Each structure stands twice: as structure tokens, then as C-alpha cells.
Design a protein with these regions (language model features):
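Flexible interhelical turns and helix-capping residues at alpha-helix boundaries
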Residues: 9, 131-134, 192
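Conserved G1/Walker A P-loop phosphate-binding module
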Residues: 1-111, 139-140, 144
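Amphipathic alpha-helical transducer elements in NTP-driven molecular machines
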Residues: 32, 46-49, 62-68, 82-95, ...
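Phosphate-binding glycine-rich loops and adjacent basic patches that engage nucleotide phosphates
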Residues: 12-17, 45-57, 85-109, 121-130, ...
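Conserved Switch II/interswitch segment of TRAFAC-class P-loop GTPases
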Residues: 40-45, 72-82, 93-155, 168-181, ...
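C-terminal-of-GTPase-core extension/linker across diverse P-loop GTPases
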Residues: 2-6, 17, 144-351, 358, ...
Length: 364
């Protein structure tokens, strides 16, 4: 899974990326300090991995991972090549979802590219650039299919849908907010529209606001309204605070958050929201050689889940031996669970569940 972190210059985008990856991307108070996208691979926090590691004492522990890409700051006119627009748009096409960092803090020492704090305008600026780029892409597809329609009348429905979609974009509606059937959504996916990508608005606020009553931050409330209207996710975060937390040990982090009265760090919540947004979950494999989490789409059946490990597992799938994480923990060991007949044998139609611990049987 690849997530692109975007935002106007000086909204805290690179600070958030640094906190996520500890990759040390240069976070500077001027536009375009991130010219090439910095890429960081981040472990997905999962307490089940830790518990299984205690049980198995494995030689290797491999958590699920997410790839974060810090994409250069965007300005008005990017779709026409202003600023670093063309690079920005090409990099963002490659991600599965967008984390749009929005400035919801006031600080006279950190300039805003437009001179004043206005998250609604900032969101509209980026969304409009994505829409303008999409309009050009869509028009090229319409022209191509219209030409091909002379020899293939079955494309008429496609052209009609793409024209309808372009009308929505022309009215500044994000593709992801347009109501459509599953079949139409499948058709739209063949065009790779930027504004169709799922979005989490990360509201970067001051430490004081983040630890206090969120509803008192007027900027956060405005972003929540926008997210609700287009069916996107919104998450309050303090990038500066997360950068500090990222330097702490696990124990120090827990103590620090407890002192602030915060149950979970913003980054953990961001990763969880990303999973939810993309409809992802994890199953686990456990043994002395390795304890590992594997990321799959919700609704994935056992053979396809096995294929994440190796294509031979899917091709020669016989059955899956499955127990839930909670059931295993309750019984203390796999041997005890097997004695009680709690390890199930599941076939090709079994739909994997989050937290399943599984051993695949296969033959090729």
C-alpha cells in the first residue's frame, strides 16, 4: 500500500512525514524544500504481532508495512506546470490514497503561501488542481473512445459515462464524490483520475489545540464539514508533537501520551484510518522461524490470501488451518487449541477475517 502525503507549502507535510518514517526529510520554512518525493516504509502497529512473538520466540518478526511518499508542495496553477506542478501530479498518480495535510494552526513565524490561514481555500486549491488535471486526462479518453466508436458501437455507453463524469469535474466536483454504480466505478478506474483517490484530511494543529477540546479549533470544524460532504476521512494531528514522540522509546511514548491524556498517538490513528479507508486488514502466520502479518483486502478468500505469501500457495491450495487471534490467546498455545479442536479446517470459499492465524496446506 502506498500513501501520498500532499499539501500546500509550509503546512507541516514534511514534519509529518519525518515523524512517520524518521527519514530526516529536510523540513524547512520555505516552499519546495521537498522536490523529489521522499519515500519511507513504515511498520503497521499491531499488538498481535508482539503477543505472538512472546508466544513463539521467533527468529524473525515481520510486521505489515505501508509506504509513505512525501510529495512536493503544490501551488495554484500546478495543473498548468506552475511551481512543481507536473512532478507533483505524476507522483500522486502512483499512490493508492492521499493524506492531505491541512494547516489548522496559527504561527506568525511560519509563513502561509497565501498570507493567511484558510483551510477551506487550501483544500479547494489542491482539489481544483487535481480536477483540472483529471479533466484533460478524461477529455483525451473521450476523444479516443469516440474515434474508436466508429468501429465498435459497444463503446457508446463508456463515452456517455465519461462525458457525464467530465460535466461533474467541470462543476468542480471531485470524482470520488460522484454517485455511480459499481460497474461505472470499475470503468472510471481505467482512467486513473487523481480526484477519485480516497482522501484523509490530516488537520495539523497546535499541541495545545490537539490535547484540548478539538471542537474549539474553528479550522478543524471547517475541514470536518468538507470531509463529510465528499465522504472523505478527517483526522486531527499535531505534526510537531508526533515528531517529538517519534524520538522516544515505546515505554517513553506511552508515558508521554498518558501525561497528555491521549490514548493513541496521531500516527497510529493515521495508519489505522488508512487501513480502514482502503478496506484493508491483516492475517498472521506464526511459528519459530517467523511471526508475520500479511495485508489483504477485506473479503479476500483463503486461496487468494495464500497467494500473498507465494503464488504456489494459491495455485496448489488444499485447505487453510485457521484459529482467531483471541481464541489462541485464550488457550495459551497452538497445541492446547488443537487439543480442544479449536483449529478449523477451511476450504476455498472461506473469507478471511482480521486477525486470523493461519497455516496454508498446498500441493504443486
Amino acid at each position: 500500500m502506498k500513501l501520498g502525503i500532499v499539501g500546500l507549502p509550509n503546512v507541516g507535510k514534511s514534519t509529518l512525514f519525518n515523524a512517520l518514517t524518521n527519514a530526516g526529510a529536510q523540513a524547512a520554512n520555505y516552499a519546495f524544500c521537498t522536490i523529489e518525493p521522499n519515500v519511507g516504509v513504515v511498520a503497521v502497529p499491531d499488538y498481535r504481532i508482539d503477543k505472538l512473538a512472546q508466544m513463539y520466540s521467533p527468529d524473525k518478526i515481520t510486521p505489515a508495512t505501508i509506504e509513505f511518499v512525501d510529495i512536493a508542495g503544490l501551488v495554484k496553477g500546478a495543473s498548468k506546470g506552475e511551481g512543481l506542478g507536473n512532478k507533483f501530479l505524476s507522483h500522486i498518480r502512483e499512490v493508492d490514497a492521499i493524506i492531505h495535510v491541512v494547516r489548522c494552526f496559527e504561527n506568525d513565524d511560519i509563513m502561509h503561501v497565501d498570507g493567511e490561514i484558510d483551510p477551506v481555500r487550501d483544500i479547494e486549491t489542491i482539489n481544483l488542481e487535481l480536477i483540472l488535471s483529471d479533466t484533460e486526462v478524461l477529455q483525451r479518453r473521450i476523444d479516443r473512445d469516440t474515434k474508436a466508436m466508429k468501429g465498435d458501437k459497444s463503446l457508446a455507453g463508456d463515452v456517455q459515462f465519461f462525458n457525464f463524469l467530465k460535466e461533474q469535474l467541470d462543476n468542480a466536483v471531485n470524482a470520488r464524490a460522484v454517485e455511480m454504480t459499481d460497474e461505472q466505478r470499475e470503468l472510471m478506474s481505467t482512467v486513473a483520475l487523481l480526484s477519485s483517490k480516497p482522501v484523509i484530511y490530516a488537520c495539523n494543529m497546535s499541541e495545545e489545540d490537539f490535547a484540548g477540546d478539538l471542537t474549539e479549533n474553528k479550522y478543524f470544524n471547517k475541514v470536518k464539514e468538507i470531509a463529510a460532504a465528499e465522504g472523505s476521512e478527517v483526522l486531527p494531528i499535531c505534526a510537531e508533537l508526533e515528531a517529538q514522540i517519534a524520538e522516544l522509546s515505546k515505554e517513553e511514548k506511552e508515558m508521554f501520551l498518558s501525561e497528555l491524556g491521549i490514548e493513541k498517538g496521531g500516527l497510529d490513528l493515521l495508519i489505522q484510518k488508512s487501513y480502514d479507508l482502503l478496506g484493508l486488514m491483516s492475517y498472521l502466520t506464526a511459528g519459530k522461524p517467523e511471526v508475520r502479518a500479511w495485508t489483504i483486502k477485506k473479503g479476500t478468500k483463503a486461496p487468494q490470501a495464500a497467494g500473498k505469501i507465494h503464488s504456489d500457495f494459491e495455485r496448489g491450495f488444499i485447505r487453510a488451518e485457521v484459529i482467531s487471534f483471541d481464541e489462541l490467546m485464550k488457550n495459551g498455545s497452538m497445541a492446547a487449541a488443537k487439543e480442544k479442536g479449536l483449529v478449523r479446517s477451511e476450504g476455498k470459499e472461506y473469507v478471511m477475517q482480521d486477525g486470523d492465524i493461519v497455516l496454508f496446506r498446498f500441493n504443486v
